[in-house]
Amino acid sequence: MDTSHTTKSCLLILLVALLCAERAQGLECYQCYGVPFETSCPSITCPYPDGVCVTQEAAVIVDSQTRKVKNNLCLPICPPNIESMEILGTKVNVKTSCCQEDLCNVAVPNGGSTWTMAGVLLFSLSSVLLQTLL
């Protein structure tokens, strides 16, 4: 038997075994409940075999006061996206998203301040200009 063929077969079997072992460890999700957006959350191994990582961004409005919080968790299925509801005079706007990759349920950053975005834009434009001049 050809040695290179045997080596390739062994490598293929090892690769398949590693890929299966990685998925057998379970889906990793961030988990926290009712925390401010900027709060970092610890990760957990999802206990559900076909579970999903869930991000919920909620704006709770009482009178004219708004409080924004997030929930990151693992669930067996993706919950329906209920965008707006009212509970006992309290309005709640919820945006729900689901994903099935490790640590994919991170809340989307808000983009930072106007000066930060202007600096990034200026840097991008200057690097393009520099490349065209060189």
Swiss-Prot record:
Residues 1-26 form the signal peptide. GO terms for cellular component: external side of plasma membrane. Transmembrane segments: none annotated. Residues 27-119 form the UPAR/Ly6 domain. Pfam families: UPAR_LY6 (PF00021). It is found in: Cell membrane. Keywords: Cell membrane, Disulfide bond, Glycoprotein, GPI-anchor, Lipoprotein, Membrane, Signal. Widely expressed. It comes from the Eukaryota. O-glycosylated. Not N-glycosylated. It is a lipid-anchor; GPI-anchor. T-cell activation. This is Lymphocyte antigen 6A-2/6E-1. It comes from Mus musculus.
